């Protein structure tokens, strides 16, 4: 893919994602003012549960499927991948549904309104069945964005129509579920039109699960904890603290999610370049992605520190002023998260370093969990936000160590020079060998 075409595609993807944030800018203050702190806390807790179920249903299938589709040579091969992944996700959806019901009854916040938890579980299953990975693997980058914008518009109309007061939290989940089902109908209809009907089967599910386990372990160590932070806080603190943390986390999630559009273009491109033997081109594309992500991480770090005390109370109201302090703690996470996104997505996934990702992901998840269990009961929302920062920082340290050991440091802008300076300062001989790559 030439540079000009890449810029156009990335620009279109970011323009589509702009609709996501316009949507959130509308609904987040609407939720805060219409539902209040307690009602909004229930919505945030249910959305956290939805994200956990989403991760369980997805189970690392998306990056594996995207990687396989990027290398596919025919429609028949794509249909075979499509059929296998749909079969596996249906099975995982049944398991995720059972887990969601149990989690609903165990949460003091959600058990008071169990229907919200049920709707959140169904929404997580529907979200986990999405086909964005298929479109990205086939380099149809614009298609999932158009479908997603359609879903946002539909849910926005439903939310603004149905949510009228503090007791209408259930209609938020119902609106999101209807929009998710409608978007899935469109995406599956388009894929079936292009590739044919999926052939559901049990054969091949176990090998797919085995191949996806390493990436799932990475996501379960970091991403699942990230998605479940609000739910964990419902077990350790009060609904008010859940509301303060959830509001700040939502803004942090918005900032972090802006890394996603570029990844949707860079990761399939790097994967295809490596599959075609264009190692030099893959390295160049990787460095471009690194520069973009790291610059963005520093930008949102400065913005969150400086603007949080003014922006959050203005958008959510004075009652959410404690959320601004939580977001300022989250700000220290952004540079680490940008580096982690680059190494995991742009370096390791295209080069099939799944096992290494699993090891560091599990270690980071344990650090996250231990820090949260220690800090959340004492400091509430600020404690669990600090635990997230600690987890991301430790993940960055581990990923950097692996990159150096694999001699892939040349893919990090300025990494080779910085490592050489550290070695000279420590009295070691400078490394002169060129970077190796699979």
Which residues does each predicted region cover?
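Interhelical loop/hinge segments that connect adjacent transmembrane helices in multipass membrane
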Residues: 1-6, 142-145, 169-170, 176, ...
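Signature of the first transmembrane helix
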Residues: 5-62, 213-240, 369-373, 388, ...
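Membrane-water interface segments that mark the loop-to-transmembrane alpha-helix transition
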Residues: 8-21, 46, 51, 55-105, ...
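Helix-terminus/linker motif at the lipid-water interface of multi-pass membrane proteins
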Residues: 23-39, 161-164, 223-254, 272-273, ...
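Interfacial segments at transmembrane-helix termini and the short loops linking adjacent helices
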Residues: 37-38, 104-120, 307-336, 382
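Helix-loop junctions and terminal segments of transmembrane helices
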Residues: 58-74, 86, 252-279, 283, ...
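Membrane-interface junctions at transmembrane-helix termini in multi-pass inner-membrane proteins
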Residues: 77, 124-147, 334-360
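Hydrophobic alpha-helical transmembrane segments
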Residues: 114-124, 145-193, 363-367, 381-405
């Amino acid at each position: 893919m030439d540079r000009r075409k890449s810029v156009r595609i990335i620009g279109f993807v970011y323009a589509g994602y702009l609709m996501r944030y316009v949507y959130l800018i509308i609904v987040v203050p609407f939720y805060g003012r219409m539902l209040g702190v307690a009602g909004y806390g229930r919505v945030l807790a249910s959305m956290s549960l939805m994200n956990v179920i989403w991760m369980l249903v997805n189970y690392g299938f998306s990056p594996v499927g995207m990687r396989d589709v990027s290398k596919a040579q025919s429609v028949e091969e794509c249909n075979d991948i499509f059929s296998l992944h749909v079969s596996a996700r249906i099975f995982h959806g049944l398991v995720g549904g059972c887990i969601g019901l149990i989690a609903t009854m165990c949460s003091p916040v959600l058990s008071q309104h169990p229907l919200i938890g049920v709707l959140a579980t169904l929404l997580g299953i529907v979200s986990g069945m999405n086909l964005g990975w298929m479109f990205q693997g086939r380099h149809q980058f614009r298609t999932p964005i158009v479908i997603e914008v359609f879903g946002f518009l539909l849910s926005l109309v439903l939310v603004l129509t149905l949510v009228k007061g503090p007791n209408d939290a259930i209609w938020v989940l119902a609106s999101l579920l209807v929009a998710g089902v409608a978007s899935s109908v469109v995406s599956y209809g388009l894929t079936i039109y292009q590739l044919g009907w999926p052939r559901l089967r049990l054969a091949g599910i176990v090998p797919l699960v085995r191949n996806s386990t390493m990436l799932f372990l990475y996501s379960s160590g970091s991403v699942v904890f990230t998605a479940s932070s609000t739910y964990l806080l419902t077990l350790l603190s009060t609904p008010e603290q859940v509301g303060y943390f959830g509001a700040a986390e939502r803004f942090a999630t918005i900032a972090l999610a802006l890394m996603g559009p570029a990844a949707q273009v860079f990761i399939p491109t790097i994967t295809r370049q490596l599959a075609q033997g264009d190692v030099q081109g893959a390295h160049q594309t990787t460095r471009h992605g690194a520069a973009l992500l790291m610059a963005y991480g520093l930008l949102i770090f400065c913005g969150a520190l400086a603007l949080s005390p003014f922006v959050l109370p203005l958008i959510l109201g004075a009652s959410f002023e404690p959320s601004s302090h939580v977001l300022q703690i989250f700000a220290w996470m952004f540079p680490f998260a940008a580096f982690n996104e680059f190494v995991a997505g742009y370096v390791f996934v295209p080069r099939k370093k799944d096992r290494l990702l699993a090891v560091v992901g599990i270690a980071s998840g344990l650090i996250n969990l231990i820090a949260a269990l220690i800090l959340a009961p004492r400091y509430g929302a600020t404690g669990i936000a600090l635990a997230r920062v600690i987890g991301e920082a430790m993940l960055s340290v581990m990923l950097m160590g692996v990159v150096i050991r694999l001699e892939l440091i040349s893919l990090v802008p300025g990494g080779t020079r910085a490592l050489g300076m550290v070695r000279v300062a420590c009295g070691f001989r400078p490394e002169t060998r060129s970077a190796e790559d699979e």
